[in-house]
Design a protein with these regions (language model features):
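Short beta-strand and adjoining strand-loop segment in the mid-core
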Residues: 54, 112-119, 149-156
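Flexible, glycine-rich terminal cap/loop adjacent to redox cofactors
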Residues: 135, 146, 151-249
């Protein structure tokens, strides 16, 4: 393989995700020889191949055969004539309510240009809601149960709040954890789930379903999961919320 250097301006890679997941992925990448600089600001790209960045007051460089710039997205709505139509925007994003209506009631907007969670499956869900509402219904979008997937090796998947965000929101938080390497009744509402494991992106839908329908950790732990399957780690983690995990190493 080729040497890889990651330059990240925020305090950690995957910032905003679960802290345990961020830390573990950092360790996995480092063990594979990836050089990671966090809290670093890119200053310039010289000759298309040399990255000049600043970290802790020092100017550093990283060279490579390819430079990938991944700093987010911005809306491309300037040529759509939105202002003339009376559709309000903010920093180029189209303002919509929970029913996906713009400031012009008969005009709806979906997808990345709404400035919500910029994921393909969110746009699909928004499209369904908008279509129903355009036909006279009054459906609303929920963004608290949207799963997010990162297709690394191993995969990362998450849904709902992190432990830190749940605590900051004033929820009494209990955490259940289960190590996938050990894989071969609670009244607590499920607020979030964060997985770093093979097939994580296939498993996260179960917890999205739990959050969407207000299920408890007990509902997950009481559901018999087939063995051996990777998805049974969700049952084990739910058991661990009350310290009742049978197979935790």
């Amino acid at each position: 393989g080729k040497p890889v250097t990651i330059v990240e301006m925020l305090p950690s890679i995957l910032y905003g995700n679960d802290s345990d997941v961020c830390r573990t992925m950092t360790e996995l990448l480092t063990d594979r020889g990836v050089t990671i600089h966090t809290g670093a600001k890119v200053l310039e790209i010289r000759d298309g191949l040399t990255c000049v960045f600043e970290k802790e007051g020092q100017k550093l460089t990283a060279e490579g055969a390819v430079v990938i710039l991944a700093t987010g997205r911005k809306p491309d709505t300037a040529a759509l004539g939105l202002e003339a139509a009376g559709v309000a925007t903010e920093r180029g994003f189209v303002l919509v309510d929970d029913e996906l209506r713009t400031t012009v009631p008969h005009i709806f907007a979906i997808g990345d240009l709404t400035g919500k969670q910029q994921l393909a499956h969110v746009a699909t869900a928004q499209g369904i809601v908008a279509a129903h509402n355009a036909a006279g219904a009054h459906r609303t979008m929920r963004y608290d149960a949207v799963p997010g997937c990162i297709y690394t090796t191993p995969e990362i998947a998450c849904v709902g709040l992190t432990e830190e965000k749940a605590a900051a929101a004033g929820h009494p938080v209990r955490v259940g954890k289960f190590n996938v390497s050990g894989n071969g009744r609670s009244l607590a509402m499920v607020l979030g789930c964060h997985i770093l494991a093979p097939h994580a992106t296939e498993m996260i839908g179960e917890i999205a379903l739990a959050i969407q329908n207000g299920l408890t950790a007990g509902a997950v732990s009481d559901t018999i999961h087939a063995h051996p399957t990777v998805s049974e780690i969700l049952m084990e983690a739910a058991h661990d919320v009350e310290g009742l995990c049978c197979h935790k190493l």
